[in-house]
UniProtKB/Swiss-Prot annotation:
This is UPF0297 protein Sez_1866. Belongs to the UPF0297 family. It comes from Streptococcus equi subsp. zooepidemicus (strain MGCS10565). Pfam families: IreB (PF06135). NCBIfam families: PRK05473.1.
């Protein structure tokens, strides 16, 4: 796969943003209830793509797999920047 020197645009629908946020919250709580470190497990999943980082408990694994990992990363970056006073257009 070749790479280009051109900047590529990536866009995520506003409705998906809200659903990803709700899904991450639900997955976080499921991981916490099972005694895992939710942050470590979510990071493991996002970096590797291995769904084994997220348990089937409360259907958490199926919920998080509804979204591409790049969509999850985009929502996490957006949330972080907005929380630090950056005006996201």
């Amino acid at each position: 796969m070749g790479f280009t020197d051109e900047t590529v645009r990536f866009n995520l629908d506003d409705g998906d943003k809200k659903q990803i946020s709700e899904t991450l919250t639900a997955v976080y709580h499921s991981l916490d209830e099972k005694g895992y470190n939710p942050i470590n497990q979510i990071v493991g999943y996002v970096l590797s793509g291995d769904p084994a980082y997220v348990p089937r408990y409360n259907d958490a694994r199926n919920q998080i797999r509804k979204y591409e990992r790049d969509e999850i990363v985009e929502e996490l970056v957006r949330y972080y920047l907005q929380g630090n006073g950056i005006d996201i257009r």
